[in-house]
Design a protein with these regions (language model features):
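Short, small-residue-biased leader/transition segments that mark boundaries at the very start
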Residues: 2-9
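Contiguous hydrophobic segments
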Residues: 10, 77-82, 86, 168-175
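Metal-dependent amide/peptide-bond hydrolase catalytic core
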Residues: 104-230
Length: 230
């Protein structure tokens, strides 16, 4: 694979130059992102097995100028969660809406009200993203479906903000179930926590990057990203 080839090149370079003190371990992370391979590696003892004291990683970003490095101390990338909402109503013929419990109308209300978590429930000083990314319902023009499905992602830097989102989602989903007289189920999946850099390691990484690209190509206080990594 491309990643495997890159690791081999780095290994050969480090072996041939050896212009550093100490040891370097090159880690290939399986199941990157979706399955959380980073956490599994730590749980299985990779850091203890090879006596790894610090971990450095590079995240490629296509919109960053070639050769430029961005980093910062503290939280730099957000934590990423997923949510799934199932709206269960009563389907029926589109000509007789009074005989149905329309999940689409309820789903629209839920999606609109979810937007108020950021605009009305959150402290404006706290960073938060709540994005609805999928809505699915129905398969034909003249039938009210029984189900509607809403999926999306939440990005936070703070656990208290994460818990606020969960609380408000539960209230919104429950409230719409009562309002429309149908069933709504929320499944909230906590994903990767925020990426947090220690100040000492940021200094080390920034100095190394300056040796490669020059002082003007390194920003060691770049600002936070709402993207996430495991």
């Amino acid at each position: 694979s491309l990643v495997g080839s890159e690791m081999c090149i780095r290994d050969r370079y480090l072996s041939e130059t050896r212009n550093f003190a100490g040891r370097v371990a090159l880690i290939f992370q399986p199941a990157e992102e979706n399955e959380g391979g980073g956490r599994i590696m730590v749980e299985e003892g990779i850091l203890d097995r090879f006596d790894i004291k610090n971990v450095y990683a590079i995240h490629n970003t296509p919109d960053v100028e070639l050769g430029k490095f961005y980093t910062m101390p503290g939280p730099i990338m957000a934590g990423a969660d997923k949510f799934h909402i199932d709206v269960v109503g009563v389907g029926g013929h589109g000509a007789y809406p009074h005989e149905t419990k329309d999940p689409i109308t309820a789903a629209i209300g839920i999606v609109q009200t979810l937007q108020t978590i950021v605009s009305r429930s959150r402290d404006p000083n706290d960073k938060l993203v709540v994005s609805v990314t999928q809505i699915h319902a129905g398969s034909t023009d003249n039938v009210t479906p029984q189900n509607a499905y809403i999926n999306g992602t939440v990005r936070t830097f703070d656990k208290k903000v994460q818990e606020l989102v969960i609380k408000r989602m539960e209230e919104i989903v429950s409230g719409h179930a009562q309002t429309f007289g149908l069933e709504c189920k929320l499944r909230y999946e906590k994903g990767y926590p925020p990426t947090i850099n220690s100040p000492e390691n940021v200094k080390t990484a920034a100095l190394a990057a300056e040796d490669i690209s020059g002082v003007n190509m390194v920003d060691d206080n770049a600002g936070q990203e709402m993207g996430a990594e495991d």
